[in-house]
């Protein structure tokens, strides 16, 4: 399944009230469908969510979690071959992951946690609080091993987990959940089928990470 990210957009004040946002969004989704994409997903805030779930036919799946964690993620079974497959999950290829981590405007730092797990740090809400994520290096990604710093001591430093993971799987470790009232803009995760009715996707069936969109 191929999916495309629906970027957050706005209409210039001089051109508001003419239906341009809805028209251009519909044209963009039609173009994505013609290009072979099956789904579109987005990460709107509370104000933008009704426009996507109403006029544009997106389904609201869940709110994204936001946690400040101090240690690498907790893994219930460290010897398992990666995470369980979810209903919605990004499957990285070598080229796609290299491209994502090489963004010149928001470059991610990387280090191997162990031979199977890549740690990544990216732009966050403050210079001393980076966004943090971990990627399981399956057989398809093993050619990238030599590009990353080797495993080292665990850093007891604050980092932001922003996304959604199934309960009982890989989860933030020694973490504090940020209440909605303290977030500048709480984010939701929405999905749209570009070729028909959007099926219901349960929040516990989603693996969605900060690498799947640009929060900062």
Where are these regions (language model features)?
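Short, flexible loop/turn elements at secondary-structure junctions
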Residues: 8-13, 44-46
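Amide-forming acyltransferase catalytic core, primarily the GNAT-like/NAT-type
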Residues: 33-39, 46-143
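Conserved GNAT-family N-acetyltransferase fold
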Residues: 4, 9, 119
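C-terminal functional modules
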Residues: 168-216
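Conserved beta-strand-loop-alpha-helix junction that forms the acyl-donor binding cleft
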Residues: 40-52, 158-171
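Structural motif
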Residues: 113, 133-139, 156-165, 193
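Conserved acetyl-CoA-binding loop-helix of GNAT-fold acetyltransferases
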Residues: 11, 16-34, 138-151
